[in-house]
Structures are given as structure tokens and as C-alpha cells.
Amino acid sequence: MIPGKYRSVSGRAANNVNCGLHLVIQTSSLPEKNKVEFKLNKDTSSFPGRLLQHDLERNYSSRQGDHINLVSSSLSSFPILQRSSEEKILYSDRLSLERQKLTVCPIINGEDHLRLLNFQHNFITRIQNISNLQKLISLDLYDNQIEEISGLSTLRCLRVLLLGKNRIKKISNLENLKSLDVLDLHGNQITKIENINHLCELRVLNLARNFLSHVDNLNGLDSLTELNLRHNQITFVRDVDNLPCLQHLFLSFNNISSFDSVSCLADSSSLSDITFDGNPIAQESWYKHTVLQNMMQLRQLDMKRITEEERRMASVLAKKEEEKKRESHKQSLLKEKKRLTINNVARQWDLQQQRVANIATNEDRKDSDSPQDPCQIDGSTLSAFPEETGPLDSGLNNALQGLSVIDTYLVEVDGDTLSLYGSGALESLDRNWSVQTAGMITTVSFTFIEFDEIVQVLPKLKIKFPNSLHLKFKETNLVMLQQFNALAQLRRIDQLTIDPQGNPVVNFTLWKYYVLFRLSHFSMQKINGTEVTQNDMIMAERLFGILAHVASSELPQYRLISILGDARKKQFRYLLESKGKKPGIINEENNDSKRLVGENTNRATLNYTTRDFYNEKLEEIKEKKKFCKTYIEDLVKEATEINMKNEALQKLWPQMFIELVRDAVIEIRNKNSYMKLCLQQITDQK
């Protein structure tokens, strides 16, 4: 609000004034009698006082009536203002030239005492000819055509400057107006707040209806209490928290869409009244309680008084929103950590595969030089696995060491799915899982884990997660059909998903049929998302049925019994006993039972030996061979020595016998001496 001392004259005195406006045009410097005088009499309406409020689209002006002479001189392009002595006495400190169709500011002589000057509703394009009015306190140029702020450098006492509804594009030339109290620049074309930081006494700033897109550069306005920024294009606000006295801030009808763009308002301790209506943010459901929660000092929001109930509700909703944000932030962090961990596991997996590929290439070169026969273990022919005996490439080793500082595996439970990334995740199966969580898991996914490592934990998987029905394998190095044999030890499988990425076995045309054949006792429903039909089961049996028969027929009976589990041994013995019976004795039902048992038994002989187990077996065989060789060599050596000793004895014995007889005859030749000698020996022994 404009201070009372800056308002126009109000009251009855102004209402009763009926003055005439005298416009005198002087064409030359002729005597007074040659002047042509035009008189326009009118009743001027009163202006009791204008308020510079937050919606200051009207401007302060004074409509007092004056008897004014504007003289146009041939020596100057500006009209010269003249007032009578009576008018100067009556309105000594103010002058109103409102609605005079002025295009320039007239020359005002002899009016150095003026304090209020009104040029409202004219066509003035430039501020000039007022530098001599150094006592001027209020200057009103509302509704003109001014394009630049100028001509004010000498008005050091100016307190109120009203330049609303003009064509000003830039705030400038206010350096000397350090006493300015009210600055109205609404309805112009200003795009940036600038050059006002020195106005430390400014209390009211109106920049409504301009082209501002952001609010900043407000430092130094230590006395500012009201800031009107309505009807702009503002998207974010800064530096408002640096205004210690700001109480009223009007941001209606802008483009503010989030509280983060005006977060500095929360740090303002003096702000009590603010408006956001007409902004996108005001349409949000969280708008009111967010503003109230962050600006506890507010008394009014959007011109409505804030109640204690609204504050309480805002506090409750804000707490819920904060908890939601924290949870969302936590989930985002977990997702990012998951992404980084999976990427790291993938890098380690790629390095490992590259290392294995290099070792395999070296082994192939060695094999080409010295071919080896495939080894037989437990009657089953196994493909030879390359032994990891070669040194690790230095570059790969350094890369692995660099990655070791980050998480190298990930265990994730999402609903009913347990996802394991990296071989280290298999250790999670040793944890104490709650009964509720373990019973909830129905899908287990393996990614970036060697299948041979997975095989070793399948017994634990069966025990820890008894309800698991769906297995997924991605980047697990499934390379041959025999590996599917290992899945037979599980309790149940309804679905099986083998991702083509990192599992070359899916390139085999018949891999699905082999899975159905080998795991037929599970009665699987889907493979890679495709329903299993009865025709698929029949085709699988036709393709691979003979394989199980051949495998079982090649093994001896003791090996078959050792392969079968305890639960099947009785059935297998029954099968062996029934082989000796005549076909006529066995009824139809026993034949069906024998066929079923025979199928399960035959399939059980198709097992899979992991690379580690295979290497252990190789080491065991090598150790046995080494022991046997050493043992036989020792036996041969000992037998050879015995034989040599025996031959030597045979050669020496005749001469030894003669010498023994001779010594005995000589010893007993003197009977008395011999007896004494024997008696002496007996005495010595005692």
C-alpha cells in the first residue's frame, strides 16, 4: 500500500473543485495580446487515494483539477507549463496532467517545490524535463508508451515510481533512487529482474503481467515486504529466502509445476501470505499440504486464511508423503544397486568365459598332438572336460581383481520368484530361510552361473524350497543334453525355461523332446512357455526310448543297483525276479507294472557327472593307478631280492655245511673242555 503521505488529495475539497484547463499556444515572441488562447472547462472527478496492492493492475494517480497553461514555443519542441499564482498556492506540492494527450513531458518551470507529479493516461514515450524537480517524492507515469527508464538520476528524494502499463523491456537507470519505497512496473515487457539490488529501502515491487520466466537476483532488497509477480511465465523462484522482511508474495497465474522449483520459499521465515492459484502446481492433490508442511509460518494461502485443522491434516499427509518418498528412494537405490551388481556379475562372467575359451583352445592344441581316448567312469562314457591348469592371463587377472571390490553376486526375492546372479549367490541356499518365504517360492532363476555348480546345490534346493515348480536358466553354459539328466533328482518340475543366451543346447532341434523323455516322471506342463501336449510325450518316447534301454543293458547288475535310489531298489529286485518267470505265469497287470518300473529304471541309468566330479574321478583313478604301480613294483623288487638270496644260498650252502660240521667236530673233540665251556656259558647266563 502506498503510504498515506503519497496519496492524492481526497475528501470534499477535491470533489468541489471546478477548474478550467487553459491551453495557450504561443507561435512567436509577440506581445501578450497576440496570443491565441483555447479554454476547456470541465469538472474533474476526485481520486481519493490509490492502493498499490498485490493485484496492482490499476495504478496510483491523482485527479485534482488544475488551471494549467501549456505554451508551445518556436524555440523549443516541448510545451511549457504555466500555472497561476492562485493555483500554485492551492496545489503547491502536486501537479496532475492526467489524460492530456501528451506525447512528451512539458517543461515545468518555477515548480521546484513539487512533491507529487501525475502523467497518467497520456502518450509519453520518454521521461524528460523533470530533472529540476529534485524534491519530487511521487512520480506517476501509468499508461503511457515509455520504452526505457531514463531521466531520473537527479530525483534522489523519489519514493514512489509508478511506471505500470508501458513498453519497458529492461529495468535500468535506477542507481540514484536509493530512497525508492514503491516501484510499480506491471504491464510492461520485462524479461529479467536486474539492477535493483541497491534499493535497500524498497518495500513494494510490482512486476505483474510481464514476461519473466524465472525469479532471482533479489539480493539487497532488505526492506521488501510485498512482491507481486502475477501473470508472468515463471517456472522457478530463487533468492526469495534472502529477503528478510518479505511478507506477501503473489505468484498467481504462472508456470510453476513443482514445489522443488520454489523450494527456497521454505527457508523464508518472514513470509506469511502467498498465492499459487492459476499454476499447474495448484491442480495437484498434494499441493496444499506440501506447501503448508514446508512453510509453517504461512497465515494465508491463495487469499484464504489457514486453519489449525488444515495445518494438522497437512502435517499428517506430509509425513505419509515423506515415508512414501523415502520408500521410493530406497527402491530406486536398490534398483540401481541391482543394476550395477548384475552388470558387474555379467562382466565377470564374460571374463570367465573368455578365460575358459582360451584354456580350451590350448587344450585342443595339445589334444591334436597327443590324442586321448575317452575315459570310462562307472560304465558311462563321458566327454572329457578341459582341466583349468593353465596360468590366467595377466590382463584378465587384473580385471578380475579390479571387479572384486564390488558385489559379485545378487540374491533377490520378488514375489514368488527367487533370482540368483553369480556363483556366489548359490551360498544363499545354506541360509536359514523362514518357512513362510521358503514356502512362497515357486520359481527359481539362475543367471551367470555354471550349470555344473548348480547341479551341486540341487539337493539343497529340493529341501529348502519344496514348492518350487519352475526353473529358469540364463547364461548357465548348458551345452549338451546329458546335463538335463541332473534335474531328475528334484522333487517336481512343472515348467522349465532355457534362455538361448548363454545356453547353446537350445540350438539342438530335439532338446525339448529329450527333456520330456528324461524328466517324464515330472509330467511337465510347459517348456519355454509352450504347453506340452500328449503328442510331444509320444514323440519323445519314440526318439529316445531305445537310448535308455541300451544304457541300462550295458551296465552290470551291481552298477544298476548302486545307481538306483533306496526307494526303487525293491522295485528293481522285483523286476529281476520276474525275468526268470515264464511269460504265461505273469498276468496282464504284472506286465503293465513291470513295464512302468522298467521305464523308470532305464531312465535312471541316464545320469550326469559334473566336470568337478569328473576331475575328481580322474584324480582318483590316477592315484589308484599310481598306488597299484608302486605296490606292484615293490612286490616285484622284494620277490627279486628273495630269489637272488635263495640262489646265493644254494651256491654257498655246501661249503657252509662242511664248515659247520667241521667247527662242531673240533669243538667237541675234547669232551672235558667242551663240558667246562658249556657249564661256564650257563653260569654266565645266570
From Swiss-Prot:
Residues 360-388 are annotated as: Disordered. It comes from the Eukaryota. GO terms for cellular component: centriolar satellite; cytoplasm; microtubule. It is found in: Cytoplasm, Cytoskeleton; Cytoplasm, Cytoskeleton, Microtubule organizing center, Centrosome, Centriolar satellite. LRR repeats lie at residues 113-134, 135-156, 157-178, 179-200, 201-222, 223-244, 245-266. The keyword Ion transport does not apply. Part of the neuronal tubulin polyglutamylase complex which contains TPGS1, TPGS2, TTLL1, LRRC49 and NICN1. Interacts with PCM1; TTLL1, TPGS1, TPGS2 and LRRC49. This is Leucine-rich repeat-containing protein 49. Residues 279-317 form the LRRCT domain. Residues 303-341 form a coiled coil. Its main location: cytoplasm. Pfam families: LRR_4, LRR_9.
